[in-house]
Each structure stands twice: as C-alpha cells, then as structure tokens.
Amino acid sequence: ILEDNDLYYRTIAKVDLINKKLKTNIFHCYNKNKQEIDVFLEDYVYFSLLLISVYEVKNDKNSLKKCENLLKETWELFYDSENQLLQKNIKRTNDIFVSPIDVIDNNIPNGNGIFLLACNKLYNITADESWKSKIDLLSRSFHSCINNNYSQMFSYLKILDIYNNNITFTFHGNIEKLNKIKKELFKKYFEISTFIHRESNDEDFVVICKNKVCSNKLKSLEQVNNYLNEKSI
C-alpha cells in the first residue's frame, strides 16, 4: 500500500523472528521469569492469518502448509461441539469461573471471526472440502449469535461480508511476471480477498472471481482494471 520497500523488508524480518519464536510451541507471552504463558484462541488464529498472508504476498508455500497444520490444531484444541464455536481457552484447561465461549469483540476482533477469515482463504487456495464444512458450520453459528450481540460483533459482520462476496485473484504462469498487477491489486483488495498462486510454464494471466463468477484470462493491468470496473468489484 505504501510502496515502502524498507518497511516491507523490516516486516518480513519480524515475521521470520516470530516464526522462530513459535517454531516449537505457541504461547501468549512471557512472565517476568521468561516462562511461557498459556495460549488463547487469538494467539493461534492471528498467527495463522499472518502465515497465510505471507503466502499471499510471497507465494511462500511453507507458510501455507504451516497455516494449514496450525488451523487443524486450532480446531482440535478449541472447538466446542456443544456450542458449535471455538472457545477462548484450550478445552482441557476450562475454568468453571470463566465462560470459555466469548463471541464479542474486545480490543481486537474476536478469534472466531479471524478463524473463519483464515479458513475461507485456505479453502479458496486448497479447495479442500474439510475447510468448507467448518466455514458453513461457523457461519451458521455466527448468524445465531449476532441476533443477541449485534452491537459487539462488528468484525463478524465484516468477515461474513468478505465470505459472502468471496473475491479471489488467481495468478497463473510465471508469478514474477505478474508482480506489477499483483502489487496494484494489493493496495485495494488485500484485506477483503484471497490471492492465489498457480505456477506453471504456460501463459501468464490472472483470473478474478467473485462468489464463483469468474473472469476470462486477464493478461494486463488494463484488462484487470476494466473487468473490476465493469463488474463493480
């Protein structure tokens, strides 16, 4: 967005540092004795979203695979089948004095919504139906919760809107040759869409989809912009 290369490289360095810190164990923070504090749902899902964002920016397949594994682990650790939502703390550490299900936004958007956002990106990229079933289940649960907590669930409304529009940009061929188009699209659409890479030795083009309605092969920035304007995306 800022076209600041120095900021970009410093950010990538910070991401690499986070990856190293969380390589063997995800934790919330250190205490004064530098001991690790147990995690919450948000620690897992925000790290997952960071990983899949790195894939979208850099075509880093290792980050994509790590995100996939981490979201699977998140589901196993936090999903409450009775409430059909992800609870705030790991299931085995439930505290009877604290409600483990928390669906409202606090200082940051709620972890359930961020899981849905990352999960939808992952489904768009991998086409793995197991992610689609989780998306459908959570979106139904969100709709029922919104009726009672509308004023405190704004991030859910935004994420459900992103999910319903489901905008994707798929880059085919030599990804490096499409970087100019990709950088321009990042400025406006990175937050509300999924960027997908399909490397091959064939022709280079972009396909834009919104809610399963897709463009033809678009080979220039002009063609991309014309399509976006024509379809009001």
Task: Indicate residue ranges for each PLM-predicted region.
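Glycan-recognition and catalytic cores of secretory/periplasmic carbohydrate-active enzymes
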Residues: 1-233
